UniProtKB/Swiss-Prot annotation:
Keywords: DNA recombination, DNA-binding. To lambdoid phages excisionases. It comes from the Bacteria. The keyword DNA-binding applies. The keyword DNA-binding applies. The gene is xisE. One of its GO terms (molecular function) is DNA binding. The lineage of its organism: Bacteria, Pseudomonadati, Pseudomonadota, Gammaproteobacteria, Enterobacterales. This is Prophage excisionase-like protein. GO terms for biological process: DNA recombination. SUPFAM superfamilies: Putative DNA-binding domain. InterPro entries: DNA-bd_dom_put_sf, Excisionase-like, Excisionase-like_sf.
Amino acid sequence: MLQMLTLEEWAAEKYRSNPPSVSTLRRYAKQNLFCPPAMKQGRLWRVREDAELVGELVTPVIKKNDSLLLQRILSNGSQTA
């Protein structure tokens, strides 16, 4: 079973020298740039040991004139405002 590592532990394992700073890793975690995504547990962000940085994934543009059903689908099934 894969372990959940703190961002610092993950960076030390992935980068042999000159890892990103902790604040940069936290920003990446908040922006969902890890695959699988990082999870916040208490005060710490944790990622699976096999996690990778994937960069910005494309998100669909939701227009106000789109149908309500399409807006719901594009917003991951959550209710529209």
